[in-house]
């Protein structure tokens, strides 16, 4: 950080005062296993943000850009209901086989199918990598152990809350753009979108894109 500040690069200033801890997951055992590694640093309910899923606002002009409020909305929902919740996004029938697909009733998730075929999908609403987990998460992850459930451990956690009628659905609307950077084209789109939001790049990039489209 210091070398950047000394050169007048202040774009990381919003991180001032935030303490960050890193844990390295040396074995690919899934999300539940990764969360368990941070057990000693977490107290109470907490947000889970999957870094390969980028949620931001849709925009038609640079001046209309606003930061995403998805995490804030999850916190507000939890404070109102005291129940865990997951953000979901309508991906259309052609993409359901890439994600966990849910059905909903009265604001709650009632079923969850992991990467179904289009014929078996209960809906077109996908889990999009943004959650608010409850304080009982670690006890439940020990109950649904990684040794028994492997990488699907975190799915069993969600299903437990779902069976209790406690898993809320936070439905994202068209004001939110979701980029799944695990897909090469989605990753490229996210980079272009980000650059178009940057005043130092936007005009030249738009001009270059127009030229390439001619």
Short names for language-model regions:
Residues 1-49, 55-56:
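Conserved N-terminal catalytic core of the sugar/cofactor nucleotidyltransferase
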Residues 17-19, 42-45, 51, 79-84, ...:
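Short coil/turn connectors at secondary-structure junctions
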Residues 27-28, 41, 52-55, 60-61, ...:
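Short acidic/polar capping segments at secondary-structure boundaries
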Residues 38, 52, 102, 134, ...:
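Residue-level signal for inorganic ion chemistry
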Residues 48-51, 87-90, 173:
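Short beta-strand segments
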Residues 57-95:
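Conserved donor-nucleotide/metal-binding helix-loop-beta segment in metal-dependent transferases, i.e.
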Residues 60-67, 75, 79, 108-207:
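Catalytic-core segments of class I nucleotidyltransferases/pyrophosphorylases
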Residues 96-110:
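Conserved catalytic core of nucleotide-sugar-dependent glycosyltransferases
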């Amino acid at each position: 950080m210091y070398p950047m500040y000394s050169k007048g690069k202040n774009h990381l200033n919003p991180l001032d005062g935030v303490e960050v801890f890193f844990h390295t997951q040396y074995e690919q055992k899934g999300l539940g296993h990764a969360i368990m590694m941070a057990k000693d640093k977490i107290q109470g309910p907490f947000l889970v943000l999957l870094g390969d899923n980028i949620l931001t606002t849709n925009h038609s002009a640079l001046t209309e850009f606003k930061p995403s409020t998805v995490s804030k909305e999850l916190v507000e929902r939890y404070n109102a209901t005291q129940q865990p919740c997951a953000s979901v996004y309508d991906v259309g029938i052609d993409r359901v086989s890439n994600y966990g697909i849910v059905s909903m009733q009265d604001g709650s998730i009632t079923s969850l199918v992991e990467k179904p075929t289009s014929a078996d999908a209960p809906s077109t609403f996908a889990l999009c990598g943004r959650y608010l987990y409850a304080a009982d998460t670690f006890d439940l992850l020990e109950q649904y152990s990684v040794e028994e459930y492997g990488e699907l451990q975190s799915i069993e956690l969600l299903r437990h809350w779902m069976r209790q009628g406690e898993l809320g659905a936070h439905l994202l609307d068209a004001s939110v753009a979701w980029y799944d950077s695990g897909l090469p084209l989605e990753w490229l789109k996210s980079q272009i979108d980000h650059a178009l939001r940057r005043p130092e790049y936007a005009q030249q990039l738009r001009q270059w894109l127009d030229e390439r489209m001619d």
